[in-house]
Amino acid sequence: VIIALPLANNKQMSEIINKLDGKVNKIKFIPELNGTYTFNSNIEDYDGIMLVSSYNGMNRGTNKFLKRSFDIITGIVGCVVLGILYLIYAPKIKKDGGKAMFLHARIGQYLKTFKMYKFRTMYADAEKRLEEMLSKDEKLREEFYKNFKLKDDPRITEVGKFLRKTSLDEFPQFINVIKGEMSFVGPRPVVQKEVDMYYGEENSRKIFMVKPGITGMWQANGRSDVENYDERIALDLYYIRNWSLWLDIIITIKTIKNVIGKKGAY
């Protein structure tokens, strides 16, 4: 698709590109010199007119192979570490009578529901406790529905607090990576209620074209320190539009630094 609208302002051009993004393989447009677009792009000449060719790198066959290869390598390493962590922490987690790991329904690629693995960090009756707390405390309810998290969550066990602070509770998700349900790096895996409340049709169409990730732009930028939900969605959209294997490597390095420094974790 070629967009040639010399009288359109930056906002109008952005709206048109956003509507086409994901519906066609390639977008070409004549930009204003002061316009800023952060998509994967190339500059092309079209009979003396400068075109910016924008594309989604994830749609290319070679890139899909590279990303899946990266997932398999990190998935194997992650599962080996998971085995060691399970031997150490499973007995401690089971002390309150529940299972060491649990499955939680999340929305994956193409809006399909899948079961995501996690170490159990909450009491066995956590959902019941949550309903009771939210029904009694309006401020707590507002905090929870803002980010679907509570900073001082009374449902979390003592060992669970440590697992969350160190992000070790995420390691079972490497099983999902090996199964092909998740990527190591990708948009945040969310629940259906988050999709209904915050995403909208356009954002859902773009974000759920790809697999969710164990880590991503949100985690690399401070995890829970990113408080605005719209900002989280914007970070996921930026990742999809600008994906490259190098970006995955950068996000991985930044995530490791944040985990070691326990930045934004609770």
Which residues make up each language-model segment?
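Residue-level signal for cytosolic alpha-helical hairpin/rod architecture
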Residues: 51, 156-159, 234
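Short beta-strand/loop motif that positions the catalytic acidic residue
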Residues: 237
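N-terminal hydrophobic signal-anchor/signal peptide
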Residues: 1-83
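A short, structured surface patch at a secondary-structure boundary
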Residues: 143-210, 251-259
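A hydrophobic, helix-centered structural microdomain
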Residues: 62-129, 176, 245, 250-266
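Short, glycine-rich, amphipathic interfacial segments at transmembrane boundaries or analogous
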Residues: 34, 41-44, 101-154, 215-234
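Hydrophobic alpha-helical segments characteristic of transmembrane helices
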Residues: 23-24, 28-33, 171-177, 220-226
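Short hydrophobic alpha-helical runs that function as membrane-insertion/retention elements
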Residues: 28-29, 139, 183
